[in-house]
Regions:
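Short, solvent-exposed aromatic-acidic interface loops
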Residues: 53-58, 136-141, 191-194
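Positively charged n-region of N-terminal signal peptides that target proteins for export
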Residues: 1-5
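Active-site-adjacent helix-turn-beta-strand microarchitecture at beta-sheet edges
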Residues: 91-165
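Conserved, well-ordered active-site substructure
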Residues: 93-111, 164-212, 221-245
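Short acidic-glycine loop/turn motifs at beta-strand connectors
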Residues: 42-45, 89, 124-129, 157-158, ...
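Bacterial N-terminal signal peptides
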Residues: 7-15
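Zymogen propeptides
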Residues: 17-114
């Protein structure tokens, strides 16, 4: 039987050029007897966005309100996660930049709580890719950013775990954070069972291949994933990071 040239070329292309990986890939991951959900975002294909308030100026406080707002603009939420700590009025603690506009300034203050467990840091995205910098180092840069959120503590700096973390710590919480695989690949993770800071840092370093990672929050940690059919609605949220289509 004669095979057309087109069919032969099509078969060859399917063998030699496999389907492109999804731009947002969420999956379960078991690491050191703990379960995590990990979402990787390819910035060459998708754009990360930060959300805080709707067009009327009201804080979203969660994924459902964000979804409704986006739907009114003809957009759909693919993935989202809480993206930093906030004050009682849901305003960000520290730097918050969305759409290139600074909503809240960088904080170099000292204080109580995880945000001030220094070194803390900033996750940011520019035209050339994503990065995480310790707060004082970020303060020295002057290039524009598309988005940025400040939080703390840093989980990893140049592959080194935060010096105040204790491997055997009994401070166990649901936690979420963000790490840099490469300037064009960002990984966000949430623990599906309580973990300590040290365990969470090991996840980013040893399982996800990050050298820089930043803690986003704990206890309120929440995930929305269209692919996984997951929509956490645990507690009110402040800043939210996500991908839309």
């Amino acid at each position: 039987m004669r095979v057309s040239l087109f069919a032969a070329l099509l078969a060859f292309s399917l063998i030699c050029w496999p389907a492109r990986a999804p731009a947002v890939e969420c999956r379960a991951l078991d690491f050191h007897d703990k379960r995590y959900t990990v979402c990787e975002v390819d910035l060459t294909q998708e754009k990360l966005r930060l959300f805080l308030r709707d067009v009327a100026g009201n804080p979203f406080k969660g994924f459902d309100a964000l979804k409704r707002s986006l739907a009114g603009q003809g957009e759909h939420l693919l993935f989202a996660m809480n993206a930093g700590m906030y004050h009682p009025d849901y305003s960000p603690v520290g730097l918050f930049v969305t759409g290139g506009e600074e909503i809240s300034p960088l904080s170099t203050a000292s204080g109580e709580g995880n945000f001030f467990l220094k070194p803390n840091g900033v996750f940011f995205v520019t035209q050339s890719g994503a990065g995480i910098l310790e707060t004082s180092r970020y303060a020295q840069r002057h290039q524009p950013v598309l988005l940025a959120t400040q939080s703390g503590p840093m989980l990893l700096q140049n592959g080194e775990i935060h010096p105040r973390f204790i491997a055997a710590s009994d401070s166990l919480r649901t936690r979420n954070g963000v790490g840099i695989v490469s300037p064009q690949r960002v990984v966000l993770a949430i623990s599906d069972s309580p973990v300590n800071f040290y365990e969470f840092s090991l996840l980013f370093r040893d399982a996800l291949g990050c050298k820089e990672a930043l803690y986003l929050d704990g206890s309120i940690s929440s995930l929305y994933s269209l692919k996984l059919e997951r929509n956490d609605n645990l507690k009110p949220l402040g800043p939210i990071i996500g991908v839309t289509r």
